[in-house]
Amino acid sequence: MLERGLSELGSDAGGDQRERLLRFLELLRKWNRVYSLTAIEDPCEGVRLHLLDSLSIASFLHGRRVLDVGTGPGLPGIPLAIVQPERRFVLLDCNAKKIRFVRQAVIELGLANVVPVQARIESFTDAEGFDCVLARAYASLAEIWTDAAPLLRTGGTVLALKGRRPEAELGDLPAGVAVGIHRLRVPGVEAERHLAELKPTGQDS
């Protein structure tokens, strides 16, 4: 299922990367028995809703530094970091048990390009800034932009994963924000998936 799904997404993930993706899923299932990190327990659903859903936005990432806000148990950050080792990912969450799991997963999977951080985005600072800030099931677009915009480098974008097209949220965005809405196709998932791409008005892609 994973190999077929990756093929449908156009991913060129190699054998070692596919193995790491499945190992991550197994680690998540193992820790979930004690820490209740996710409501998804079925392995097939995990492939679709954790791995493939996360990787459906891989082609939208750019630049070297990526921040995953409200990463929870490392989603979408860890799957993306596995298939894009050339980028550096900071995985941010205020939940101690979830960041504890992410730290252990990073160690066991040998992900040298991932830094887990336990903090709230409102109090998080970073001198270098980020090319992409990711948010999956995090907040409204206006809230995401308010929190994430100060952390963007010049040319940076906020990528917010949504279910249905977030029409009602678009009107709440402040002036000066350019928005692109992309329909995502996730193999094996019938529910709607959209990606909102936010950046300052007038900024070239």
UniProtKB/Swiss-Prot annotation:
Organism annotation? Methylococcus capsulatus (strain ATCC 33009 / NCIMB 11132 / Bath)
Catalytic reactions of this protein? guanosine(527) in 16S rRNA + S-adenosyl-L-methionine = N(7)-methylguanosine(527) in 16S rRNA + S-adenosyl-L-homocysteine
A Pfam family in this protein? GidB
Look up the domain of life of the source.
Bacteria
Indicate where this protein is primarily found.
cytoplasm
GO CC, sorted alphabetically, is: cytosol
| Membrane-traversing stretches | none
| Family label | Belongs to the methyltransferase superfamily. RNA methyltransferase RsmG family.
**Keyword line:** Cytoplasm, Methyltransferase, rRNA processing, S-adenosyl-L-methionine, Transferase
Q: Which residues bind S-adenosyl-L-methionine?
A: G70, L75, I121, E122, R136
Instruction: Report the CDD domains cross-referenced here.
Output: AdoMet_MTases (cd02440)
- Look up the signal peptide feature and give its range: none
Summarizing the function annotation, the protein's role is: Specifically methylates the N7 position of guanine in position 527 of 16S rRNA.
**So what EC number does this one have?**
2.1.1.170
One MF term in the entry's GO annotations: rRNA (guanine-N7-)-methyltransferase activity
Subcellular location field: Cytoplasm
**Stated name of the protein:** Ribosomal RNA small subunit methyltransferase G
